[in-house]
Structures are given as C-alpha cells and as structure tokens.
Amino acid sequence: MKTKLILLYGGKSAEHEVSLQTAFSVINALDLEKFEAEPIYITNEGEWVQGPLLTGKLDFVEQLRFSATNTVKLAATESEKSEGEAISPAVLEADDQETVVFPLLHGPNGEDGTVQGLFEVLNIPYVGNGVLASSAAMDKIVMKKIFADAGIPQVPAVAVRLIDWKNYQEEMVSEMEEVLTYPVFVKPANLGSSVGISKATNKKELEDAMTEAFLYDRRVVVEQGVVAREIEMGVLGNDTPVCSVPGEILPEGAVATFYDYKAKYQDNNTALIIPTEVDPEILEQMKEYAVQAFLGLDASGLVRADFFLTDDNQLFLNEVNTMPGFTPYSMYPLLWQETGLPYSALIERLVDLAKERHAAKNALKYKLED
C-alpha cells in the first residue's frame, strides 16, 4: 500500500512564497509509485484548503495556490486559479492508510512548533522537528541560550524587547555600543529566511534597523558582525544524527552585503560552493558542534547548521534552521546531494525518519499500571 503523504504549505507568514517554492519542488520530486500525494494549502489569511490528489508533475507554482470553492481542480494555465475545498485541520487524523504529514512551512505558524503541536495532538507522524526543537530554534534568543549552555561558541549579541526600546531607546543604544562594535546585524527573534534582518554600520542605521525588525517581532537580537566565511552543514537523523559535507555561501559583488532574503531566493549571483575546503581539524569541530546543537535542541529529521569561520580559524555557530530552504537548488538538499543522497532519496529518508520517531513515541507508556 502506498504511503499517503499530506503536503502542507503556504501559511500565515512572511515566508509564504518561499513555502510555495518548496512545495512545488518536493511534489515534483515525489515517486508517485510509492506515495499518494495530497496537497493542503494554507492561505495568507490562515484558511486551510485541500486540493486534489496529485497524479503527476506540476507545471507551475501557481497551481498550488488554491482558492476555496465547491470544486476541486488544478489550474491548467497560469491565468486560471486552482480550486480546492476549505477544511478543518482535524481532517489530518490518520485513517487505515499509512499517513505522514510533510509540513513544508517556513517561519512563524509553520516551523515554530505551533503546527507541530497539532500533529502531536492528532497523533499523526510528521516530517521534521518536534514542538520543542522547532520552537526553541525559531527563537534566536532562546536558541543562543541553549547553545551557550552546551559550550558552543557564538558571536556576542544583545537581546532587546520592544517595550524597552520604546521606553529606553538611548540607554539601549548605549548598552549595545558598549558590548558590540559596528557593523552589527539586527534580527527579529522569531523569523527565518533573513526576513527583517538589516546590517548597521552606525547609530542611525542601527536605529533604522531596529525599527524595521520590530515590524516583524516584539523581541529583537543584535549580533556582532564578523568578517568570516559563511559555512553550512546539514544534519540528518533522529537519535544518531549524521552530518553532510560542508558548503559555503559567496554573495557576489554589491548585490548582497550579507546572505539576505533576496540573495537566498531571488539572486542568481549568489554562489554556493559544495563541498568547500575546510581544515580537517576545523571540519571535525564543526561536525561536533552541529551534532551538539541538534541533540541539545532534541531535534529530529533535519537541521541545517550555519557557521562563521574567520581568517584566524575562529569558529562560531550562527544558528540552526529546523526547516531550511528545500528546493533542489537550496543549500540543504545540495549538501546531501554532494554527500551521496539525491533529492528524491532525501525526501524518502525524511519520511522514514518521521515514521521511526512516531513509532518510538507510541511505544512509550502513557498510563500508570494499577
């Protein structure tokens, strides 16, 4: 019997369009001899719309943007709209057919533990990280505390709340300028894909960057900028994770002063070097920190660990991403491609890991013996 794979994408998030790109890529890579693919689109307003079962490859991304109607069909041309049925999330409950949810969601309400909590309540297996790892890794402030507790090196940073910024802006700026030196990077605490992130090289730019970041979150983290190589590593597994080869990001020219949203998803000038050259000792340290971060978060399925490596071989873990970009041209799948695990096989491995974790959870006792 085929595994029913529910593909959940879109979402009420600034990363809605990224999620659509990811879903399009995964769906077109699925072996439909092994999977029954069922798309569920979450609109920008948060409405869940179920599309038709997929019997072949999609032609364009817009086919996945369903409008809730009384009919269910895929658009045949880009000028048409795909149609689906408005549903309640409760329909995700597993039936007699083996069912796995693949949440292809980025950002808040997708990779922050909220939708993962729904899957746990429904007791349905799902790809990727659980509630704890998803929520902790989504919050850059909490994540930094976990890494610090594990002894993983990070760049200096200052956390700022909106209420404190409103009431004590001058004092907060002074504190940041005492702890950090320009340039700094200002980031919303709970957002991914570099949305809302700005680089500041002076006080005026810092204040403008804070204003921008607070549009996306009420908590912001300000990090010390470093001149360093940006090297990333994929981690895959459950209790015994393994690491991929390392890859390096090279935004070219003046297009990007850091690896921002445009460089990640819109800019063809961004170069990815996979595998990249790293001293053997540094590479082993990188793997150790990546696994420590994975286990410290109680992660499962997949994580991408992002590092800074300076010219004098100082290594800093910048962050981990529990649902990294997942198109065939994104860093995480490419890392595994070069490690020997092609895109389609990676998807199947993640589904298997979801089943393994779900079986292990259901084998636990949840009732005291009399």
Swiss-Prot record:
This is D-alanine--D-alanine ligase. It comes from Listeria welshimeri serovar 6b (strain ATCC 35897 / DSM 20650 / CCUG 15529 / CIP 8149 / NCTC 11857 / SLCC 5334 / V8). Belongs to the D-alanine--D-alanine ligase family. The gene is ddl. ATP binds at residues 177-232. Coiled coil: none annotated. Its main location: cytoplasm. GO terms for cellular component: cytosol. SUPFAM superfamilies: Glutathione synthetase ATP-binding domain-like, PreATP-grasp domain. Disulfide bonds: none annotated. Pfam families: Dala_Dala_lig_C, Dala_Dala_lig_N. It is found in: Cytoplasm. The keyword ATP-binding applies.
